[in-house]
Amino acid sequence: METRYTHSPADIRHYSTEQLRDEFLVEKVFIPGAISLTYTHNDRMIFGGVTPTTEELEIILDKELGVDYFLERRELGVINIGGPGFIEIDGAKETMKKQDGYYIGKETKHVRFSSENPDNPAKFYISCVPAHHKYPNVKISIDEITPMETGDPLTLNQRKIYQYIHPNVCESCQLQMGYTILEPGSAWNTMPCHTHERRMEAYVYFDMEEDTRIFHMMGKPDETKHLVMSNEQAAISPSWSIHSGVGTSNYSFIWAMCGENITYTDMDMVAMDQLK
């Protein structure tokens, strides 16, 4: 597991492209047959990919977290963006097709991941945050979620937002997690943009062609910067930063947030004339 530290807006004012990428971009999220995780000190979120092939995988981080087992004091969100697979939670095994999700509460002792076909492995994207209360484990299917439809073809930002871990779907301590799909012909996400000082966020972009690129916008509204990202890469968004993106073609992304509250609409909108 890689550790990333926090930064003030003043810290990144003079960062080079390489420095910015080193601090906020995760280039390899899904590694076949392996677990690839990042621990960010922004609200102590752990996120990354679990990509089982021939053998099942289990996240073991007791020493790193100073606990007896991974979810002793944490809650976990999972969404599969790859081939069909399985998740086993304290001995109970469930199938997980593409776009299936799971909320797993604190004090769950074992979570094991496996794939149905090693040649088409499941790709489990996970987000894990500190938790103070144990809530029930809930399997979540995209078919059961009524998407929030937003944007407009004229502004190139028409998209569907599927809220997986959200008060309308399941209980959680502070984790929110969802899946956004852009409509054909749209390129922008989260524009007009916003910040939310009370929550950090992490994005992973996927379902992209090899030569498609995302220009992920970040920074204070009056001093923006960007990361150029390719398929299945992730970005860390501190609470003070905008988080928006535009693609050279279609894409999807998973977002995950944690912080002071679980109010999805608690955000500070940024007027277009404030952007620089």
UniProtKB/Swiss-Prot annotation:
Which keywords annotate this record?
Answer: Isomerase, Metal-binding, Zinc
Alphabetically, the GO molecular function entries are: 4-deoxy-L-threo-5-hexosulose-uronate ketol-isomerase activity; zinc ion binding
Protein name per the record? 4-deoxy-L-threo-5-hexosulose-uronate ketol-isomerase 1
EC number assigned by the record: 5.3.1.17
Annotated GO biological processes are: D-galacturonate catabolic process; D-glucuronate catabolic process; pectin catabolic process
The scientific name of the source species is Enterococcus faecalis (strain ATCC 700802 / V583)
Q: Identify which cofactors the protein needs according to its UniProt entry.
A: Zn(2+)
Per UniProt, Zn(2+) binds at 194, 196, 201, 243
Classification via InterPro entries: KduI, KduI/IolB_isomerase, KduI_N, RmlC-like_jellyroll, RmlC_Cupin_sf
Q: In which pathway does it act?
A: Glycan metabolism; pectin degradation; 2-dehydro-3-deoxy-D-gluconate from pectin: step 4/5
Broadest EC class?
isomerase
Catalyses: 5-dehydro-4-deoxy-D-glucuronate = 3-deoxy-D-glycero-2,5-hexodiulosonate
Assigned protein family: Belongs to the KduI family.
The answer to whether the entry has keyword Nucleotide-binding is: no
Tell me, in a sentence or two, what this protein's role is. Answer: Catalyzes the isomerization of 5-dehydro-4-deoxy-D-glucuronate to 3-deoxy-D-glycero-2,5-hexodiulosonate.
